[in-house]
Every structure is written in structure tokens, then in C-alpha cells.
Amino acid sequence: MSNTKVRIYDLSKELNLDNKDILDICDQLNIEYKSHSSTISEEDAQRIKAIAAKGLASSTSKNSTGQRESASPAEEKKQKILALHKHNRPETGEEGESYPGQAGSSAKPTLISPPRPPVKPLVAPPGRDEAAEKTPPTAAEMLSHSPSVKETPTETPLVPEAAPTLIAPPNRPSLTPKPRPETASGRPEPRSKNAPGSNDRPRGEKRERGESENAPSPERRVGLAKPEKPTLNRKPDGKSPKLAEPAREVRETVELKRPVRPGLPAKISATSEEETDTTKKSGVDGTEIDTDTGLLGADGPKKLKRPTMPPRMAKKSTWEEEEEEEKKAAKTAKTAGKNKRRTQALFEDDDDLESELSGLINTPSFTLSTARPPKPPTAKAAPPGTPTAVKVKRPSKPTAHTGSPKSERQEPQEEKRPESIVVTGSLTVRDLSELMKVPETEIIRTLFFKGMAVNITQTLDVDTIEMIARDFEIAVETPSTQSAAIKTTEMIDVSDWESLQRRPPVVTIMGHVDHGKTTLLDSIRKTKVAQGEAGGITQHIGAYHVDVEHNGKPEQIVFLDTPGHEAFTAMRARGARVTDIAVLVVAADDGVQPQTKEAISHARAAEVPIVVAINKVDKPSANPDRIKQELTEQGLVAEDWGGETIMVPVSALRGENLDNLLEMILLVAEVEELVANPDRLAKGTVIEANLDRTKGPVATLLVQNGTLRVGDSIVAGSVFGKIRAMIDDRGQKVEAATPSFAVEILGLSDVPAAGDEFDVYESEKEARSIADQRAIERRNTRLQQALSSRRVSLSTLSIQAQEGQLKELNLILKADVQGSVEAILGALKQLPQNEVQIRVLLASPGEITETDVDLAAASGAVVVGFNTTLASGARASADREGVDIRDYNIIYKLLDDIQGAMEGLLDPEEVEEHLGFAEVRAVFTVGRGAVAGCYVQSGKLVRNRFLRVRRGKEIVYQGVLDSLKRMKEDAREVATGFECGVGVSKFNDWKEGDIIEAYEMVMKRRTLSS
């Protein structure tokens, strides 16, 4: 046995005691050890077990006698001795329990059942909830306890402080569930001690038992305790030995406080579970709490020191840590540091005050506080200012750090300037500053030094933006504009692949103006469309289908005729985007022209095959080989020259070789494998749109996939409609339109924009919601474009208007179709507007109405109509209001007249007009002055006109010709080849050989300068 070694902590587990308890016993027996992990001999272990067993036996005997003979005065005296424990709430709870135990035997079992749950609360805060749940069964006991509590103070007059203490602990437990957050720290306890007036025996018992069970565990911290708190506890009683026992229980309290630390909960729970086992055993005897007290009594004095100090130590350690942190923070922020020091001083004073109060009120206050969860909201605590001080400190630290985050947030704002920016159009000063990461003030200052006064909302053009960017060393990139002919939407979905069928090809006829596109189409259709076009030029897209035979089978080809005039670029691009094959018409006598090149670029952008029709080969001046050469320069090499481009010479007027052209078109269509799914909802493109005075909004749609039917809910761009009727290219009503066919539909709510794509939806509600959403987006885009297109701000506009520098021509534009409106607006933008700006107040398809006239009268605008009519009453209203209405059917004349109107707004300029030359051949002195005898070499001399006297290369005089005489008679003018006398009142220094140049200043109408 002597060789066997036992570790102290193993022994403590075996005895269900704390390591400190075992170490105390080792001190009493003079057993050497270093720590709780030291080993001792088996003999020493047996000695320790014996002493521990004696301590348990004595405590149990005392408690059992105290409970059974509570009525005898002798036993009461023993309880008075124990009453010193009453400083500790656990003991008062015990006495309270003894009385109810006598009152009714039936209450005892109920007493035993509640004590077990209370043990768990000691381990961790969640345990209390369980205890609180089990407390209700002891309601009867609570009623019986209340009188017993009153008896206790009367029976124990020897202990003046004990009596109030006994009352306080029960009240404290009763309040525990509510103030549970408050009691996380030991400070709030003094308040609760004064407050208790209710007697919650069951909860008090739980508190006492928990404390007694945890009594051994606090020994760990007791060794660190300072003697200050024990002395405070001794002062109230004056009996140091008796106070030892309460101190023991205080240790318990300290142990309970451990759960406050996040790192220790696991260990504490383990020890508390062991302690619960011991309490359960003692509870069966009915001497549960007395047993613990006996153990505590053995180590009384030491334990008094231990319990009191641990809370102090915990506070002090945290306070010291906070002080160190404050000192560090003070280095960075002096002001914040001063505030923290003040709060620290308050904290220290409150700490001392709280420790004194805890000593006067008795250690049980610490017990209750330590048993409760940590970090309570101490807002309710009136006497102790400590919690408040701590709270003040904590926020102060963050505030010290808050400065840094602000600076960090400000730093990223200073973003690096980009090396290059992408500019697609005009930008406001604010938008440019965001793009360049440069303050607006810098941009405004830069422009101001360059002589341009701008404000933050003013729009800058691309040239100005490039100039500003150069000053800030930023490159400006202008992205290449995407061709409008590029096909952006794939009309065939994956779901259509299983149901695809062949469809007719859509062929677009393109070429330069007057090269015979519409005549060629007329010859193919055997109609006379070209004769109906104003001026013989096509002014909007026409869609027609032609039935032809190919390989003995009937085939169909859908033709789109596009305008060739330069103003209709958008229409040509739109035609190329929806087409399958492009037929390029080139006049054999004219060659490749600008619109021919443009048509080639559109077809290439749309990635469609090109078939060239060389027209007018019947003319004597036709030279097809020259055309092929010019097309080769554009990258189109004829097949007979070794290329891949099909070129067919035709005569549209005579209808020569048209069958060959159609054959080539169908061959190309076969190679392209054009397919669509007719068994689905239709989708396609708006070819043209207009507002008809009788039909309302009308749109020409090209169905590219699916089948369009009457009654379908359609969304074209941002316009909703339900198809009421469909009309084909020959004026016949149809019920359905299959892929590749163009139809005119009625039933739209508004005029859609040409080029918009349309979709058919099953649900009218869904279609309406999509249309509304798109309308909002389009409105916002339009407003943004209107703002960005402002060339001047309102401030500069008013200044220029006052000074007469700004001229504006207000226009209201009405046309037959949407495409014509686009073309006219595009052409107007090409006019120079440096001195006169064009403001289009309204541009829409439809007839000219009285509303348009009223708008023109209010704004001083000119109403321009193109291929449209006047509504009833519009002409009379215009005459009454004095509004000028101009109607055109050829775009050339429209543009010429608008340019003339713009020039008419310009102030006429004074121009020098040459009159003639004369040579001085003699000088005559007349009175004080001199007169020059001259010979008119060219032109004429006119009196009261301007003249210059040139002597060699110098101009000697410049003034007015005052006197002109011929043969001593005044003459108004002298023509070439005649002699005359010239007199000038302010010039007499004539010399022979001088040249007189006569001129006059005339007012001349200005032209627009680009």
C-alpha cells in the first residue's frame, strides 16, 4: 500500500469535494503537496478520507437534531450559533425549512422534490429556469414558510443582524426569475437585499442548497483572496470564529459566479453535477443543507477570505485590463482618454462602496449575485454606479475607434482616376465628374479658365469632353456605333426545332435613289406602284408578296421596297435587319453611288446574301462591265469574274430577264434553308406604322415566326393592342398571317415605333403589364435623351436670348408614317445649327389637327406636314390664329424650305460691295483744299459712297466720297472711261498716280454656317 500513490484531484472526485477542501485538510494534517495534481501516499489518503467523513457526520447530526427538535430551546441555541450562518442566505433558508417540516409531514416530500432542481441552477443560469419550473409545486410550503420566517427573528434575538438576513434571502430568491439579468454581476445585489419583503421559501431553499453544494468549489479562488473583505464581514458580527461558517458559504457564491466567464462553463458544470449528487443524498436525510454547513464550518476562517475576494479580484482584473486599454487609446485620442479616466475613477469608488455595502449587508448578497447569469442590464441599480460607469467606458472605446472607420470610409472616396473613359455622347458636368472621378468644381474651374462659364447641370458635347479629359491626362474612347441592320434577336427558339417548316424568303430591294428599285418591283408584281409615289421616289417601306413557279412548284417571295434617298437610312437598315436576301439595284448608266455603298454595308451587317440587279441595261449609255468593276472595289465580285456574288442584268421598264432574277433569288433561298414554326404564337418586327384618321393607329407587321391571328393580344415595343382586323398587301382582309408575310393590323392603342419587335401573349393581362412597364422605361429614356441633347443650360439660354445671339425655329412635324418622321428628324439634325437651333415640339404620324394648331400658336411654331392631310377645322383655326402650315410631299423641298426659314431668322450682315477704280492724273488746289482729277478705269464712282486711296501698296485714306463733279457740274456717279473731279473734305494730300477704290456697304442675307 505504501507504494501506491493517489492524486489529490482524484481523491477530491472520489469524496465529492473540491480540490481546495482536500488541500485544506492536507494543511491540517501537515501533508506535503505542491498543487491539486500532486500525488500523496495511500495512507495519507485514508487519513484525509477519515477527517472528511467525520466532518460530514458531525454536520448531518447537527442538522438532523435541529430539524426534529426545533421547538426545544436548547436546539434553538445551537441554531443561534448557526445563525451566524444567517449572514449567508443558505443557512437562513435551512432554518426556514425546519419549521415547515414540523408543521406538516406531508410537506416534507414536496420539500425534497424541489431541492434537487435548484442544484442545477447553481451550475449555470439555464438551471434556474428548471428550478423555477419546479417551484410551483411547493406553493403550500410557501404559505407555511411565511409564518416561520416571522418566528425566526423573535427566536434569535442574540443575533441582531441574523434576523433581517433570514428574511432577506427568501425574498431574494423569489425575485430571482425577474431580475435574473440584473444579478449577473455582484453589484446589484445590495439593492435586492433591501427590497425583499416577500417570503418565497421554495426559492430560498433552492438558493441555500445550491450555495451549500457549491461551497467546496469556491476554494480554488479563495487562495487568491485578500484579507480586506473578510475583515469587512467580521466587523458586523464581531465573532470571527462564527463568521467562518458564513464565509464558507460565500465561497459557494464565488463558485457560482464562475459561469460568468465564457471559458469555464464546462468545468463548473462538471463540479456542480458532482455536488448535486451529494446534495441529493443529504436531502433524503432531511439534513441536506446542514451537512454542507458542517463541512464549511471546518474551514470557516479561510473560506471567509476566499469568497469575498474572488468577486473583488474578478472586478479588479477586468478593471485593470480596461485601464490598460484606456491608456493605449489615450495615446491616439487624448480627449477620449480623459473621459475614460473619469469613468475609471467613478468605477473604482463604486467598487469600494459596493464592497463595504456587501460587508455590512452580509456575504449572502455575493452568493445571490454570483449565482446569477453574467453581464446584467444594470440600468435599474440606483445606489451602485459601477455598472453605469462600465457601460460608459465601453461605448467610449468604440467612439475612440469610430474616427478611424470614418477616415477609412473617406479614403476610398478618393478613387484613382481612370486612364481612359468611354464616351458615347453628350454628358452633363456631374456625369462627367463621376465618370472621370474628378470633382465637379475642378471641371467647372478648368472650363472657366478656357473662357466657358458652365454650371453643374449643363450638358457638354463630345469635343468639350475630350478637351477636359486631355487636361486631366485621361484618354477618351468613342465606341463604334453598332449598325442598325444587325440582327439582335433570334426569332426561333429551341422549343421550335421539332416543328420547323420551310417559309418563303423575305427579299429587300435596296439601292441608290432613282436607280429603279420600285419600277423593278412593279415589273415583278405587274403593278404600277411607282406612279403613285410623289416625285417618283419611294418614301416608306412597302411590303408585297409575289407568286412564282420554281421547278414546277408554286413558290412565294415577299419583297420589301426601301427608300433610296439619303434621309431614309433608318428605313434601309430596318429592311436589312428583317430580310433574308438583299437585292442590290444598280443603274448601269450611273454606277455605284453613296446609298449603294450604304446598302452594301447594311446587308453585310445583317449577314444576308446579296444578289445584284444591274438595271437600265437597255439604255445606250449602259456599261455593265464598269458596274462590275466598281462593285469589285466594294468587295462584291461577280460569278463570271471568279467571285461568289450573283449579278443579273435586267431592264425594269421592259421586263427583261426578270425570270432569271427570280430564279436566282429562289436558289439562294434554298441554300439558306429558311424555316419557321407556324404552330406557335407569332413574333416579328414592325415594318411601318402610322395614324390613320379613320382607322386609328395602323402598323405594318412582318411575321417572322408563328402565326398571327385576329383577336391576338399583341405588344409591339411599348404599345399594347388586340388585333381587330388584318389586311394584306393587296387590300384583302385575312384571318391569319403565316411566317414571312407582311400584314397591316388595326386595334393598337398607340402608334408603335418602326423597327420595334412584337410578341403575342396568351393572356391579355400579361400583355398589358409588359406594355406598361416598357412604356415607363421608354419614357424615362426619352426624358434622359432630351436632357442630354440640350446644348445650353437655361441660364446661358436666357442670356443669349436677351443679347439676341440665340435664334430658334420651332417646328411641329406631322407625317404619314413613323418612318417618314424618323427620316425628316434625321435630316434636320444634319442642318448646321450653330446660330439657329431647330426645336421640334411635336413629331408624330397622323393628320394635322386643331390641337397642333393651338400648340403652334402658343409657341410661335411652324406646322410642317409631310404626305398628310388637315383635319376638319384645322385650316380655319390656323387662319384665325395666324399659324403658318406648310405641306410637302417630297423631302427635298421640305428640307430646303426649313433651311431657308432658318436663314431668315439670322440678322442680315453688312457686306462690302465693290463699285469701281479710278486713277488720279492731276491735283487742283481749290481754296484751302485740293481736288483730284481722276479717270475712271473700271466700274463707276458714286457720290456719298465709301472710297480708299491707295498709294502703292499702302492705304493712305479711307472715308466717304463727298464731292463728285464732271465738267464743273455735280454728278451723282461717273461711269467707266470718263474723267471727273473727286473732293474729300478730310483729305487733301492727293498725288498723281494714286488709285481710288470705290465701294459701298450693303445688307445681305446670311446663310447657315456649319
From Swiss-Prot:
Residues 54-350, 364-420 are annotated as: Disordered. Disulfide bonds: none annotated. GTP binds at residues 511-518, 561-565, 615-618. Residues 502-675 form the tr-type G domain. Its main location: cytoplasm. Coiled coil: none annotated. Residues 57-70, 145-155 have a biased composition (Polar residues). GO terms for molecular function: GTP binding; GTPase activity; translation initiation factor activity. InterPro entries: EF-G-like_DII, IF2_II, IF2_N, P-loop_NTPase, Small_GTP-bd, T_Tr_GTP-bd_dom, TF_IF2_bacterial-like, TIF_IF2. Residues 378-389 have a biased composition (Low complexity). Residues 536-540 are annotated as: G2. It is found in: Cytoplasm. This is Translation initiation factor IF-2. The lineage of its organism: Bacteria, Bacillati, Cyanobacteriota, Cyanophyceae, Oscillatoriophycideae.
